[in-house]
């Protein structure tokens, strides 16, 4: 009597897994001009960031920006650089990944940057080594912009397109109107608001060229066509960064108990001479000081991690400008960084997709 043949069924050596990719913009490796130049070249060579013709972009970058800006930007980065941990945007993002990893248990969590390090390639390698055949991608930009979310996803798919083993991808959409994000903003900001007791609140979002806002409007007739274009989300402005920013501001104001005259929405960090969305933060805060406002509290709800735009542009330069114009104090509300309410919110955004 012969024995039954052994089973030839394949036994997996490891269980297929779902992983998480947290995706942020990036940062130079150091404030040194060479590192800043390398970062700016990569960032500003992106046609979704400088959305002008290729020749014009090359000339603007190589003849105007790169010869002078790396030194100036490097000096600004040096003011916020931590001697031990380096770039605030990087270490806050790393801390967030650590917190999310701890909360999710055995779910692999990787951090990747659109520009600089850790690269998207290295993050995907990390998830592949963890045997992830499905990846949930969370772009850490609350409001959609082609120059941030769009660019990051385009680069992610470009990299994936060169790989032999491509995981299933599930992208979390912009979360500007997600209750977990809205609650986290209020949880982090409300204690600062109560302690500082401002006489006015600024909600300062990163700016964009007006042309990029118009490009996001499929109707071609809504965005920036009238003053009320961002009063509510509609089909025409569903992908409009400015409309999404105003939505975030309205909800945050409501959660803080602010009336319509207690806060102002504005946009910072404009570059070049082309029209950028208004009102501009640097002009608004001076006007408020001249109008008699003395204590100004600033939220930056487009940035989930503190960075050059919050720590240097607002907490240092904007504060100096406000006080020079007659104000007494300006306080920056910290970004969400890796605060417990934000870690909880990220987990809440991810959990239904796991």
Task: Please give the residue ranges for each predicted region.
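Active-site-proximal alpha-helix that buttresses catalytic centers in soluble enzyme cores
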Residues: 2-354
């Amino acid at each position: 009597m012969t024995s039954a043949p052994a089973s030839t069924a394949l036994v997996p050596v490891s269980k297929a897994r779902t992983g998480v990719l947290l995706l942020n913009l990036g940062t130079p490796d150091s404030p040194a001009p060479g590192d800043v130049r390398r970062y700016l070249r990569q960032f500003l060579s992106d046609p979704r960031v400088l959305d002008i013709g290729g020749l014009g972009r090359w000339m603007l970058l190589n003849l105007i920006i790169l010869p002078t800006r790396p030194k100036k930007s490097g000096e600004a980065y040096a003011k916020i650089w931590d001697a031990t941990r380096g770039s605030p945007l990087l270490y806050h993002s790393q801390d967030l990944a650590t917190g999310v990893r701890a909360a999710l248990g055995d779910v692999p969590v990787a951090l990747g940057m659109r520009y600089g390090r850790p690269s998207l390639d290295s993050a995907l390698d990390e998830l592949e080594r963890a045997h992830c055949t499905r990846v949930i991608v969370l772009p850490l930009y609350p409001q959609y912009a082609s120059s941030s979310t769009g660019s990051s996803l385009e680069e992610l798919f470009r990299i994936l397109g060169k790989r032999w083993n491509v995981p299933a991808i599930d992208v979390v959409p912009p979360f500007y109107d997600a209750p977990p994000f809205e609650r986290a903003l209020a949880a982090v900001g409300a204690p600062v608001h109560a302690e500082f007791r401002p006489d006015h609140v600024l909600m300062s979002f990163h700016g964009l060229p007006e042309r990029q806002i118009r490009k996001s409007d499929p109707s071609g007739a809504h965005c920036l066509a009238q003053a009320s274009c961002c009063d509510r989300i509609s089909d025409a402005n569903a992908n409009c960064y400015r409309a999404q920013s105003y939505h975030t501001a309205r909800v945050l104001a409501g959660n803080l108990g602010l009336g319509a005259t207690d806060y102002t929405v504005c946009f910072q960090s404009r570059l070049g001479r082309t029209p950028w969305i208004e009102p501009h933060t640097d002009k608004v805060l001076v006007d408020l000081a001249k109008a008699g406002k003395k204590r100004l509290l600033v939220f930056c709800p487009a940035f989930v991690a503190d960075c050059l735009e919050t720590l240097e542009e607002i907490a240092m330069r904007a504060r100096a400008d406000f006080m020079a114009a007659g104000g007494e104090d300006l306080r920056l509300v910290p970004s969400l960084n890796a605060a417990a309410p934000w870690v909880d919110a990220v987990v809440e955004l991810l959990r239904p997709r796991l």
